[in-house]
Amino acid sequence: MSASALDAFFGARLADTDPDLFAALEKEFHRQEDGIELIASENIVSAAVLEAQGSVLTNKYAEGYPGKRYYGGCAAVDIAEQLAIDRAKQLFGCEFANVQPHSGAQANGAVFFALAKPGDTILGMSLAAGGHLTHGAAPTVSGKWFNAVQYGVRKEDGLLDYEELEALAREHKPKIIIAGGSAYPRFIDFPRIRKVADEVGAYFMVDMAHFAGLVAAGIYPSPLPHAHVVTTTTHKTLRGPRGGMILTNDLELGKKFNTAVFPGLQGGPLMHVIAAKAVAFGEALKPDFKTYQQSVANNAKVLASTLVERGLAIVSGGTDTHLMLVDLRPKNVTGKATDESLGRAHITTNKNAIPFDPQKPAVTSGIRLGTPAGTSRGFGEAEFREIGLMIDRVVEGLSKAGENGSNEAVEQEVGAEVKALCKRFPLYRNH
């Protein structure tokens, strides 16, 4: 390469080298800054986390674990990964952490790979009741490789049906019992599930991907004293980069999990992401993280109560966490139509099935809402009450217009208010 080509390679900005992609990134930045993000699994990371992810560590291959790599030149990345491991252990008060999984699904897959064989029985919460795809849903690897038995929630109150879980465990004698999910808003009784796991000889696994940040802050009961193994994502409430992690207090199981991650499921770890995990865990160890998580929980309660006041129903009657599942049937609108209408008003949500949903999965009777991203940008209880009223106006307008009618006037009015609110809480000051 010529000197000028090298200068461009190492010094040119993305806006100059790839304007089409740069335009897409700018479009996404303004979508995030000018709109209200209520998807419960999304958050806004710090500038420091972004910096770590965009660092030179993206250039480094590092198969293996700190001090035991299959490549040379790993001294610096060993430091980064060990920081992530040590901080994760300190944050959750556990003896072992594997920070290499590329996602929560990979973390769950590694646990299954370590503890079960194809054809074994696993017991998890059904997707329809608020569980996660990776806990045995039919289209997934866990649903195809294992005999996946599913428990749910009670029809009368939307709360986890512990009696059904216990009966299924005693009947099927699963190898693994899984707790946690993607749309269950209440505390889970971990000691009760561990008791039945011990009774039937099962491993007890908790997927705390959604509420890990609340656990770290002491707001949600920790599963670590009760579960054989805990998995999580590192984004969502934990407010780190997109990735996964495995935690346990059993060092012998930890050895199995290490082998299951590498070489079992993955090759080279993403060292730039692991460095960003270390940054996020360091942030979570600071006192203001607990304040943030308490605000996340308080804001969720305010949002839920505001919606209930306006005639909407919340599955299980409320929330103990950062998320809630809104039952739209009282307004005779679908999750799909509501999600799309809110989106045009610059409020991002996701349509979500409610327990015992009569609608098809692509339509749904509900939407799922969460407060982590809004809280990260500075929204407090007053703002979330305002957001709840905005949502109600969009839903009410949609209800009056009918599924095929136009809600454009309401969407435009609310959209202008959303932009005015967001302007008071800008993102990334140096963008």
Swiss-Prot record:
Listed cofactors: pyridoxal 5'-phosphate
Catalytic activity: (6R)-5,10-methylene-5,6,7,8-tetrahydrofolate + glycine + H2O = (6S)-5,6,7,8-tetrahydrofolate + L-serine
Site features described as Plays an important role in substrate specificity, chain residue numbers: H235
Keywords: Amino-acid biosynthesis, Cytoplasm, One-carbon metabolism, Pyridoxal phosphate, Transferase
Organism: Granulibacter bethesdensis (strain ATCC BAA-1260 / CGDNIH1)
One Gene Ontology biological process: tetrahydrofolate interconversion
Entry-linked NCBIfam families: PRK00011.1 (NF000586)
Family: Belongs to the SHMT family.
GO molecular-function terms, A-Z: glycine hydroxymethyltransferase activity; pyridoxal phosphate binding
Enzyme Commission number, as recorded: 2.1.2.1
Segments forming a coiled coil: none
Pfam families per record: SHMT
Biological function: Catalyzes the reversible interconversion of serine and glycine with tetrahydrofolate (THF) serving as the one-carbon carrier. This reaction serves as the major source of one-carbon groups required for the biosynthesis of purines, thymidylate, methionine, and other important biomolecules. Also exhibits THF-independent aldolase activity toward beta-hydroxyamino acids, producing glycine and aldehydes, via a retro-aldol mechanism.
Protein name: Serine hydroxymethyltransferase
Residues the record lists as N6-(pyridoxal phosphate)lysine modifications: K236
Kinase keyword on record: no
CDD domains documented for this protein: SHMT
Pathway named in the protein's UniProt entry: One-carbon metabolism; tetrahydrofolate interconversion; Amino-acid biosynthesis; glycine biosynthesis; glycine from L-serine: step 1/1
Positions of (6S)-5,6,7,8-tetrahydrofolate binding: L127, G131, H132, L133
Localization per record: Cytoplasm
Record keyword Cytoplasm present: yes
Subunit structure: Homodimer.
One Gene Ontology cellular component annotation held by this UniProt entry: cytosol
Gene name as annotated: glyA
